[in-house]
Structure formats: C-alpha cells, structure tokens
From Swiss-Prot:
Organism encoding this protein: Aster yellows witches'-broom phytoplasma (strain AYWB)
NCBIfam families: rplN_bact
Function: Binds to 23S rRNA. Forms part of two intersubunit bridges in the 70S ribosome.
Entry annotated with the keyword Repeat: no
Transmembrane segment boundaries: none
GO molecular function: large ribosomal subunit rRNA binding; structural constituent of ribosome
PROSITE patterns per record: RIBOSOMAL_L14
Record GO biological process: translation
Protein's name according to its UniProt entry: Large ribosomal subunit protein uL14
Cysteines engaged in disulfide bonds, as pairs: none
Gene behind the chain: rplN
Amino acid sequence: MIQRESRLVVADNSGAKEVLVIGILGGTRRSHVNIGDIVVVTVKSGSGTVKKHDVLKAVIVRTKKGLRRKNGSYIKFDDNAVVLLKEDLNIIGTRIFGPVVRELSDKKFSKIVSLAQLVL
C-alpha cells in the first residue's frame, strides 16, 4: 500500500532514481493510492533533468499490492514505481522502463502505455 512518506522507484528516463510521496491528489481524506492515481513527490536521488529535492507530480504505474481486474485476476509487481509528470500532466521522460498495466490508458495516460516496454 502506497501512502505518504513511501519511497518509490522511478520508471522513466527523467534522471530521478527514487522519490518520496509527500501528497496524494484527489481529496483530503485519501490515505493510500492505487495504479493510475496521481501523487506529489520529491526527488530523493538521481541526476539529470530533475534534481534532488525537486517537487513534482507523478502517476503510479506499478504496485506490490497489485490490481484486480474485472475477470477476477490479480496483477502484482516486484516494486512500487512511478512516472514523473510536468504540471500539465505530460510525462517528463521519453522512455518507460519495465511493465505497466493497460488500465492506465483508461485513466488518460495512453502515452505511458504506448512508450512502455511491456504492457500487461
């Protein structure tokens, strides 16, 4: 379960390696997020176009908790990962590393699905 103060891996080539969740968008009482939700993060390690201590928005693309599909199956991953976003909700990087779920295209992130190496 991803909540505030959770550390996540970055799944794009924006330059950041690890981020820390400092906020959850979508209401004041939300305590945890799932795949496809937008969070506010700060960069903890990495170099490149984004620097340490930058505050950005990100979308969750993989979780250890997993995602339940309508047919009853679950998809779980080995890590919790995000893709960093600009203020207008476009992605910063040009490549997406690792698998993502196809449900992201239903949540208006079809660019992430098209750039991903593997779509489950």
